[in-house]
Swiss-Prot record:
This protein recognizes C4b and C3b fragments that condense with cell-surface hydroxyl or amino groups when nascent C4b and C3b are locally generated during C4 and c3 activation. Interaction of daf with cell-associated C4b and C3b polypeptides interferes with their ability to catalyze the conversion of C2 and factor B to enzymatically active C2a and Bb and thereby prevents the formation of C4b2a and C3bBb, the amplification convertases of the complement cascade. The gene is Cd55b. Residues 390-407 are cytoplasmic. Belongs to the receptors of complement activation (RCA) family. It comes from Mus musculus. This is Complement decay-accelerating factor transmembrane isoform. Residues 301-361 are annotated as: Disordered. Disulfide bonds join C41-C86, C70-C99, C103-C150, C134-C163, C168-C209, C195-C225, C230-C272, C258-C289. It is found in: Membrane. Its main location: membrane. Glycans are attached at N192, N267. InterPro entries: Compl-Cell_Adhes-Reg, Sushi/SCR/CCP_sf, Sushi_SCR_CCP_dom. It is a single-pass type I membrane protein. Residues 40-101, 102-165, 166-227, 228-291 form the Sushi domain. Keywords: Complement pathway, Disulfide bond, Glycoprotein, Immunity, Innate immunity, Membrane, Repeat, Signal, Sushi, Transmembrane, Transmembrane helix.
């Protein structure tokens, strides 16, 4: 008896015809089916140190291609493919290990760069040596090496600073100014300029040491300091000016004075100075000369206190009061000392073109006022005496005298 079945024998290829005979002599004919759907290679193969880039694909028809990327810590070996292809027989193309351990891209240095032969390299297995060269603006120190090696722990050996900055030419002196050099004159340094008082900076305030061709130099021309002048000082009416010249430099002085019969108002001396915008200007406006007769004179001010304690004694005033109705009899006169009114010192300032002239009007006013005050004080004293010697006091005084006479 002969029977036929469809099945799969892992020892045979897909589509092979397999004939088997049982112990009873039956013959079985089997046509093996494909392990996968015809034209589908199935999942991509595993490759050491790499992983396939599948995206959303799950089926791979004939001639499909799958690329791989290296795992962390591994780099693709140059000249080795990272792609497999689905063949007509449903198998993936042969492949080899193309990811190996490698150092990362060599360190970028501020003073040096990799030589051109290393620009396109991305695979640096252990033991790889790379070499640097100085960047523009730097010069190599012969005693130091510019090489670095990929070590066993996949790090690069340190590189000595074998390049030093080039120096720009020494700056020339700045006439009537100052050059500030904060960090030297090496490549990348900046210097600043300023002028002395009375001078203006013409040009830029700072320049930079930079690359010019194959060397380094200052990136601009040096400035200059030019002297600042003031305009001619203004003339004044009824006066003269001393210190005139053809030009007026910083801090130069002119002096004004008035003609006879005129008084100067303002600053008699002005000097040439500089504004914030470096423009010459005079320190103040010129003075004015005004005719003496037109100058207003301030009246003197006298400070008279309302009350005060007399301090300067005057000649005593003597007064005898007679007894009414009786013959006058000799009596011992009563003497009352009347102090003079306090006189404040005259503090009024008097100004005159003639030093010998005095303010007679003001003095007469003061003396008259003092006399009035003295007269008022005298009247008060008389009133006081009259009160003391009233009729009652006089009666007592007369009775006492009669008693003395009878004795």
């Amino acid at each position: 008896m002969v029977s036929s079945t469809w099945g799969y024998d892992p020892r045979a290829g897909a589509g092979d015809l397999v004939i088997t005979t049982t112990a009873a002599g039956a013959v079985t004919i089997a046509v093996l089916l494909f392990q996968t759907v015809c034209g589908d290679c199935g999942p991509p193969p595993d490759i050491p140190n790499a992983r396939p880039i599948l995206g959303r694909h799950s089926k791979f028809a004939e001639q499909s291609k799958v690329a791989y990327s290296c795992n962390n810590g591994f780099k693709q070996v140059p000249d080795k493919s990272n792609i497999v292809v689905c063949l007509e027989n449903g198998q993936w193309s042969s492949h080899e290990t193309f990811c190996e351990k490698s150092c990362d891209t060599p360190e970028r240095l501020s003073f040096a760069s990799l030589k051109k032969e290393y620009f396109n390299m991305n695979f640096f297995p252990v033991g790889t040596i790379v070499e640097y060269e100085c960047r523009p603006g730097f010069r190599k120190q012969p005693s130091l090496s510019g090489k670095s090696t990929c070590l066993e722990d996949l790090v690069w050996s340190p590189v000595a600073q074998f390049c030093k900055k080039k120096s720009c030419p020494n700056p020339k002196d700045l006439d009537n100014g100052h050059i500030n050099i904060p960090t030297g004159i090496l490549f990348g340094s900046e210097i600043n300029f300023s002028c002395n008082p009375g001078y203006r900076l013409v040009g830029i305030t700072s320049i930079l040491c930079t690359i010019i061709g194959n060397t380094v130099d200052w990136d601009d021309e040096f400035p200059v300091c030019t002297e600042i002048f003031c305009p001619d000082p203004p003339k004044i009416n009824n006066g003269i000016m001393r210190g005139e010249s053809d030009s007026y430099k910083y801090s130069q002085v002119v002096i004004y004075s008035c003609d006879k019969g005129f008084i100067l108002f303002g600053n008699s001396t002005i000097y040439c100075t500089v504004s914030k915008s470096d423009v010459g200007q005079w320190s103040s406006p010129p003075p004015q000369c005004i005719e003496e007769s037109k100058v207003p004179i301030k009246k003197p001010v006298v400070n008279v206190p309302s009350t005060g304690i007399p301090s300067t004694p005057q000649k005593p005033t003597t007064e005898s009061v007679p007894n009414p109705g009786d013959q006058p009899t000799p009596q011992k006169p009563s003497t009352v000392k009347v102090p003079a009114t306090q006189h404040e010192p005259d503090t009024t300032t008097r100004t005159s073109t003639d030093k010998g002239e005095s303010n007679s009007g003001g003095d007469r006013y003061i003396y008259g006022f003092v006399a009035v005050i003295a007269m008022i004080d005298s009247l008060i004293i008389v009133k006081t005496l009259w009160t003391i010697l009233s009729p009652n006091r006089r009666s007592d005084f007369q009775g006492k005298e009669r008693k003395d006479v009878s004795k």
